[in-house]
Amino acid sequence: MPAVLQQWIEKSEERNRRIQQLRNEVTEIMELNVMDVTYRMLVEFLADEEIEHISEMDYILRKKYEVYMSELIKEKSVSRYLRIFDKVKQEYIRKRIETPMGRLECQWTYKNTILFIPYHSDQKIVLSVERVKNRSNMVWDFQIDSSEKMKRQIFDVLEFILENYEPSRVREQKLTGLHIFYEFCRLRKIEDINCLEQVQEEDFQIFLERKIENEQRRNRLRSIVGLACRITFLQTKEIRWDATIWYLEKFKIPKERLNPSDPVERISFREVLHPENRKLLQEYMKYEIGIGEMAISTVYEKFRIIRNFLKEISDEQQKVTTCDAERIDQYLKKRQEDANEAKTFNTQVTSIQYFFKFLEVRGYVDKVPFRAEYYWEKQILVHHDRCVEEDVYMEIIQKLSNFPEHLRMMFLHLWCIGLRISEVCTLKGDAYYRQKGDYWMKIYQVKMKNYKRVPIPEALYDLMQVYLNKNRIAKEDYIFQNRKGGAFSKSTFNEQMKKYCAACDIQNGEYLFKSHDYRHTVATNLYDHGVSRQGMRCRKRILSGRR
């Protein structure tokens, strides 16, 4: 028998063996009694591709099958055959993950290949993408020649989106935005998303404009950069101290240092372009956050002052370690001209002094190159009359029924007791209690980092009991919550109050609501009715005439 014929016979026998093997697997997996033409075509294609088992089916093979069928049948019918390909693969995964070995084999993990979301091991995710599986954002090519670290970071963000966003337009926007951002990172040779620079993010916005014509859709997609930076920072085992943006939820900061009603969520070092200056600022912030005890809001205020200083000298390509008294004098005199109050300017001087003192202790400079006391300005305490006129707050009370319930309750705490808005926002379900016929409230003072108790009107106590029961607020829950169940934002409260004051035409629409004014109003009323300043300090912790 000729050798060529012998080879043909052997190949034919091998093909028939593969067909039988695959037919048995498909029949078992899909629980078929009879194979129709769609299954037969699939089996024959797999056999021709020398596929031995269904486990070898993947997205690359799917694309080949699509091309193969396009040459045999009408284009509109190809999708029918692709659905069968997907069903077989998905059913195989679904049944295999029921076993320990199968879970290990089919687990959705990062691989240097093309990943197809409909082949995810989580069946809930598979079902959620059934109607959108032909979109480009379902296909993720991790076999391209690019930074391995960047590709793994993109995969982590992809997983976060799939696991944390329900099937919706928002998830589609996140997936599409990430898909475009991944392409951008590949083309711009981004090595590490954690080290993304401001100029690169701005470049991405230009890249996005070329990709997406619709401005509204562009605006929805552009936020993906922030999400990618946040997730990649949070999911690393060790804190990335070299990252250009730090996200504070990564740090185990004692709650006494945090203000839940006005949280500092991130710290950006991107503005400081000089590498050495940025590194020193990162070292300083590592100390302030990790070892320091100041409230994070105070730390952040100092940070911004130092960052502005370093940004200016970095733009001049000057190292902070080479700054002399003359250069600092130039900078501080500029700030002196810009500052509205002596207190503001003195804070700037002190913050820069502390930073140089840190550099001195760490051995980066021999000594602080300027004397802060030379620049300090005398602070003259001025009483700012910020009291709300009676006709104003009475008009609000008369129209309070037009405000949402949570705003009504929060406003009453300002008007009745004179609390700080940060204290109102962080009240918890166990704040109110009755003792010996009197009504009290337990408050955590963010500013003082301590608890205090104050007497409250019986009417407010009764109203809050109804509110707590109606909204099923547990003892440890925040009474006024944001969408995620955390403390209500004080900035959101102020914005909403301004909106409803305008809508209710308070003072003919000219009244500008300021929450802290009500604290001054309560203090002034107490003083006018004979309560001494010392009495107000002890009882309400309110200093007359001070912010």
Segment roles from a protein language model:
Residues 391-421, 519:
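Basic, Lys/Arg- and aromatic-enriched nucleic-acid-binding interface segment
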Residues 1-358, 412:
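Charge-rich, intrinsically disordered N-terminal extensions
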Residues 378-394, 448-458, 473-476:
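DNA breakage-rejoining catalytic core of tyrosine-based enzymes
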Residues 299, 410-411, 422-427, 536:
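Alpha-helix N-cap/helix-start motif at helix boundaries, enriched for small hydrophobics
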Residues 363, 414-435:
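Short, charged phosphate-coordinating catalytic segments
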Residues 494-538:
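Short, basic (Lys/Arg/His-rich) helix/loop patches that form interaction surfaces
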Residues 457-510:
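Active-site/catalytic core of tyrosine-dependent DNA strand-transfer enzymes
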Residues 427-462:
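Conserved tyrosine-mediated DNA breakage-rejoining catalytic core shared by Y-recombinases
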